[in-house]
């Protein structure tokens, strides 16, 4: 057994994923129409984890949850805003004078403004763009993985492909 006090590289997520260990809680704020989100979800499942999937356009997170996700991700609210295909410009959300409350109001009224996929694991919270970002939050993958477009991400031994 690894001593977490003396082994700085101990990986609690990988440890928990081993046979006989309790399941890992993973949440993905997901849009099934988004290829990046679908690839991220597939990588989570490739690690042997069935996450709690929140289709955030159908079931938007509360204002408090969005604020917490932004803080825990380190990206801040502006870092979680999606511009393309949203009312971002029409609402003037690029204005740096807007407060966090104003941004939260906009996200609550228009959940499409929340960028995706957001993933929560015991290792942290990340906006997984590109989708490979999720690998930093997961234990070793269960085998090879390629994105929908065929781009390899993980090799047959469950390791990230060089350059990814």
Question: What residues fall within each predicted segment?
Answer:
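Long, low-complexity, intrinsically disordered segments
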Residues: 2-3, 162
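Local sequence-structure signature of Cys/Sec-based thiol-disulfide redox active-site neighborhoods
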Residues: 17-47, 51-59
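Thiol/selenol-based redox catalytic cores and closely related redox-interacting motifs
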Residues: 56-164
């Amino acid at each position: 057994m690894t001593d977490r006090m003396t082994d700085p590289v101990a990986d609690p997520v990988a440890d928990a994923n081993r046979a006989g260990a309790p399941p890992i809680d993973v949440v993905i704020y997901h849009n099934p129409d988004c290829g990046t989100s679908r690839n991220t979800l597939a990588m989570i499942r490739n690690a042997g984890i069935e996450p709690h999937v929140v289709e955030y356009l159908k079931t938007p997170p509360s204002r408090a949850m969005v604020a917490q996700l932004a803080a825990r991700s380190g990206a801040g609210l502006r870092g979680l805003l999606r511009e393309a295909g949203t009312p971002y410009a029409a609402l003037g959300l690029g204005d740096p004078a807007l407060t966090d409350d104003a941004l939260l109001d906009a996200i609550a009224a228009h959940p499409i403004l929340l960028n995706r996929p957001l993933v929560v694991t015991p290792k942290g919270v990340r906006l997984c763009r590109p989708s490979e970002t999720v690998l930093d939050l997961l234990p070793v993958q269960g085998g090879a993985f390629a994105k929908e477009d065929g781009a390899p991400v993980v090799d047959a031994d469950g390791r990230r492909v060089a350059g990814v």
